[in-house]
Amino acid sequence: MLFRSLDPHSGDPAELQKAADLLKSIRPYVQNFHSSQYVGSLANGGTCLVVGWSGDIIQARDRAEEASNGVHVAYSIPKEGAPQWFDMLAIPKDAKHPEAAYAFINYLLQPKVAAANTNFIHYANPVPTATPLVDEAIRTDPTIYPPADVAAKMFTYSINTPETDKLYTRLWTEVKTGR
């Protein structure tokens, strides 16, 4: 959508069709659509380009470096912008022990714990006071902590109407199947 200068939140069928048509035009060059196999394939050189989550790309980069296989993995956010990515913790409405869940979340949000998690998994965390505790190589990696000018071009997904969800599903199925 952004590549076509369209609003990524649009539910307009004509705009969504334009985006789908662009994806269909490159479909012959797409090897497969998969949400997890690309990490290993990218790390071992079996795939040359993926659209994926930063954490997955970082894992592929680290695996390639550890294997010393000559594969160089890099991550890039399109200049037009991209969806923001983040993981969440949620407590089900009918949780049997919500106090324990809150205690666990509060533990994870302690600066030292959040920084230790970031240092281990190479995912940014939402705790500003943890940032100084994060290893400098991670803290300054724009793959993990995008600079402000890049972050300003990012967006979160919106909630679609059921009709728009159906249209997205139909168009995406057409893209994947090459129709």
Locations of regions flagged by a protein language model:
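Periplasmic solute-binding protein
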Residues: 1-4, 86-90
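Mature extracytoplasmic/periplasmic domains
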Residues: 92-152
